[in-house]
């Protein structure tokens, strides 16, 4: 209902304003910025019920992207990284290079305005070679996230998959301090 053509990506922005005039001014400014960038060929302004439809589309997006037919799946191992907005462009570029280095593709999904990234490599975990890639990609992205002083668990907990990377992310001394605190409970 608002997507034109076959885009490589969608970026949805929400603009809030106190008056219709302020809103219109913000929309005109944003559209001009997007057009001047040359990075987008389409822009749609949604109002009314279409806003709710777009939000539902966004909510369904990760499920749709993760529902790949066959043994190749968008796997959860690095899906909760977060970096500062000022580092987002460089982080994504380096992440893309990591994936190219492994000759792999990934699903890119994000709350970009918050720097929260839901990146999922597409792997076949029935193959031992892809299980090894799962581990290598996770390790490389943990190091990349650390390089940008980001969080490897920006929205959710560390869990089984990311727990081993806590010392890397917070340092051995801080990790040992946390272990000592936990031992008291």
Model-predicted segments: where are they?
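Noncatalytic alpha-helical scaffold of FAD-dependent oxidoreductases
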Residues: 1-111, 115-154, 159-185
């Amino acid at each position: 209902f608002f997507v034109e053509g076959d885009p490589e990506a969608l970026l949805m922005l929400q603009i809030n304003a106190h008056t219709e005039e302020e809103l219109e001014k913000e929309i005109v400014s944003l559209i001009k910025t997007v057009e001047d960038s040359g990075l987008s060929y389409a822009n749609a302004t949604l109002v009314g019920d279409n806003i709710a439809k777009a939000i539902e589309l966004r909510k369904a997006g990760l499920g749709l992207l993760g529902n790949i037919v066959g043994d190749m799946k968008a796997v959860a191992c690095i899906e909760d990284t977060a970096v500062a907005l000022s580092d987002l462009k460089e982080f994504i570029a380096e992440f893309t290079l990591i994936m190219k280095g492994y000759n792999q593709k990934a699903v890119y999904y994000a709350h970009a305005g918050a720097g929260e990234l839901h990146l999922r490599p597409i792997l076949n975990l029935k193959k031992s070679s892809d299980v090894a890639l799962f581990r290598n990609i996770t390790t490389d992205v943990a190091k990349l996230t650390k390089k940008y002083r980001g969080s490897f668990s920006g929205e959710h907990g560390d869990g089984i998959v990311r727990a081993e990377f806590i010392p890397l992310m917070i340092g051995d001394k801080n990790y040992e301090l946390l272990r000592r605190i936990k031992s008291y409970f």
